[in-house]
Amino acid sequence: MPAPSLAGGTSHDRPRSRPALSPSRAGDYKQCPLLYRFRAIDRIPETPTRAQVRGTVVHAALEALFALPTGQRVPDRAAELVRPAWERVSADSPDAAELIPDEDLDGFLSEVGKLVQTYYSLEDPTRFDAQACEVYVETELENGVRLRGFVDRIDVAPTGEVRVVDYKTGKAPREFTESKALFQMKFYALVLLRTRKIVPAQLKLIYLASGSILTYTPDHDELVRFERTLSAIWKAILAAGATGDFRPKPGKLCDWCDHKALCPSFGGTPPPYPGWPDLRDAEVVAAKENT
């Protein structure tokens, strides 16, 4: 999955579209229902961090790398893609440009360059072609749950096997964050199962900061069970969405939350609930569950 979107703007100038479930939003709800509300319904802007901007630039550089002919995907050429990738990201996101001042830019680009070069210790991009990079995927399950997200890379072997690849610019995860990363990859595997009618042969997480790889082989029955898990999460979200009852769930990650000032657990008051963008979603799901 790509690094988080760095788009700016206020919650008032963003259109309220029909909600869908992505790996990030599902993770938000599991972590803290109120965080889900702030991000998915109120859409309160968050200031990007240096690490997020760095991850976005790395993703942009690797996407540009795979757009080159196979023989040109060498380390020196990849290094040349770093600055143009930054220029695209900073042009699209004024917040990102402000976060990295001119006097710090060379050091920042050096950080990005090291991560891009680490990639070559894990894969040789001159030996294969990706079928697609930064792929938007979307499907709707039978019970009305809409799934969507972006896949960093999809590879298809000459024999037809599909591999789903995700770049991580942080270090290899511990047990908790490893399960979170695999949740994301199973999500994409399920979308491919429903859209392409295939089970990916491999889910591959590439950790560029630590120079390590995590692979996983899903099976059909496992993805069907995972589909039920997502349906249960969505049912809980819809129930909260109908009433506005998104409760905070304090934990260790609260120290890194942008919304502590609005959280009742820390003495704050959330903004007035704007209502679920499309209450018909709840009605459709309820009708299908009762048939």
Predicted segment positions?
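C-terminal, charged and often intrinsically disordered regions of DNA end-processing helicases
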Residues: 1-52, 279-291
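Metal-dependent nuclease catalytic regions and adjoining charged, substrate-binding loops involved
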Residues: 5, 10, 76, 159, ...
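Short, polar/flexible loop-turn hinges at active-site or ligand-entry regions and domain interfaces
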Residues: 42-51, 67-73, 174-175, 244-245
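A non-catalytic, helix-rich entry segment at domain boundaries
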Residues: 61-133
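Hydrophobic (often cysteine-bearing) scaffold residues that line and stabilize catalytic clefts
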Residues: 50, 54, 108, 181-184, ...
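Short acidic (Asp/Glu) and glycine-rich catalytic loops that position anionic groups and cofactors
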Residues: 34-42, 59-62, 91-92, 165-169, ...
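Mg2+/Mn2+-dependent nuclease catalytic core
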Residues: 135-230
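Regular secondary-structure segments
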Residues: 59-70, 234-238, 242
